[in-house]
Swiss-Prot record:
Its main location: nucleus. GO terms for molecular function: snoRNA binding; telomerase RNA binding. Component of the small nucleolar ribonucleoprotein particles containing H/ACA-type snoRNAs (H/ACA snoRNPs). Keywords: Nucleus, Ribonucleoprotein, Ribosome biogenesis, rRNA processing. The gene is NOP10. This is H/ACA ribonucleoprotein complex subunit NOP10. One of its GO terms (biological process) is snRNA pseudouridine synthesis. It comes from Eremothecium gossypii (strain ATCC 10895 / CBS 109.51 / FGSC 9923 / NRRL Y-1056) (Yeast). Non-catalytic component of the H/ACA small nucleolar ribonucleoprotein (H/ACA snoRNP), which catalyzes pseudouridylation of rRNA and is required for ribosome biogenesis. This involves the isomerization of uridine such that the ribose is subsequently attached to C5, instead of the normal N1. Pseudouridine ('psi') residues may serve to stabilize the conformation of rRNAs. The H/ACA snoRNP complex also mediates pseudouridylation of other types of RNAs. The H/ACA snoRNP complex mediates pseudouridylation at position 93 in U2 snRNA. PANTHER family: H_ACA RIBONUCLEOPROTEIN COMPLEX SUBUNIT 3, RIBOSOME BIOGENESIS PROTEIN NOP10. It is found in: Nucleus, Nucleolus. Gene3D superfamilies: 4.10.80.300.
């Protein structure tokens, strides 16, 4: 079992252990992706996130 989350009506995360909510919405993993020092595409990802204003402030 992994910790999962879905967004509540107020936009905040609601944590659960289920893969699907009772309303039928698929939940997302609450854990970050694995880090690899050999990541070849990190610069492109950061550039895209900066371009579309998706970086946390």
């Amino acid at each position: 079992m992994h910790l999962m989350y879905t967004l509540g009506p107020d936009g905040k995360r609601v944590y659960t252990l289920e893969k699907v909510t009772p309303s039928g919405e698929i939940t997302k993993s609450a854990h970050p992706a694995r880090f690899s020092p050999d990541d070849k595409y990190s610069r492109q990802r950061v550039t895209l996130k900066r371009r579309f204003d998706m970086l946390p402030r």
